[in-house]
């Protein structure tokens, strides 16, 4: 119930856009163009603004309108010449799909061309309207849909920030459960965390699609041009967040292997895992501090037992979160990741340690640092590191 309400809350403006576009397209084709039955105008308008699509809708709308116009045109020509019938319908669908495949604009063009040809053959046979009018109606509907999207835009920033924050939340929860599982020798808890980590790909894909949709909106709508810089910044964090999720999965898998081999990492390495989880949650708060339905996970315990009393400090739960605070705490965490910490360690412990280092680099990039600057925050692992180190001095008074 609550998730349904949340979906409506995040999509209500898209519904309004689609309904308004359908009404405007029908009015324009009926009263301005004088078409007696402009069925395809509202159809193309609201289908092109599919309210449940997650991703760039302009390309989606273009493909649908192109497919509809193609199917209407092919259907009108074939059925006007050959008349209605089963084999005529088969031929119309065949020709429409072949042309759609030849154009090569994606599967939506092919499918919409075929469905429009079927519609012409069965519900709206030739002779009810002029052929060019129905093609024009489809084009008009698509253009009005894009116009409504440009003149009545929704603010893509909150949803884009929220979806990135959700992915980071899930990663933080997984790391917390892995750390607790290692501490308590609880293989089942780690296995459950690994399952959650493996299920995050859908959320990562959704994050990529929603931010791409937001970037498209600020490009199309003049009313959103002032937000282009913010969307570009969010678009830049998609890759490091994706990398972070992948690193969390590798870490969780290796933790399972460590338990199977009775090679539990040292308390210091487990502390690093907890620190990465808490730092990931801090970065999440930096992006979106608003409560969400996914605030309380269905797995594990709530991650309130953080590492702020350990060897390194993270931001207090109730304190303000700024980029400077998040970067400082990540650099302090990175400074503890000395290679000497895993001297003589097992392979599993070394892999977990290496994944923690990679996670810190990913989170620093999310906070705005370049990859080179993020890597420089780590203690070097060789005498001749590729990036000159700029490691935080742990003797400083934090």
Model-derived segments and spans:
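Alpha-helical transmembrane segments and their membrane-interface boundaries
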Residues: 1-94, 98, 106-107, 343-347, ...
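Transmembrane alpha-helices and immediately adjacent membrane-cytoplasm interface residues
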Residues: 104, 126, 130, 134, ...
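Alpha-helical transmembrane segments of integral membrane proteins
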Residues: 89-101, 110-124, 143
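Soluble C-terminal extramembrane regulatory/interaction domains of multi-pass membrane proteins
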Residues: 233-398
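A cytosolic-side transmembrane-helix exit/cap motif
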Residues: 59-66, 107-117, 131-138, 182-185
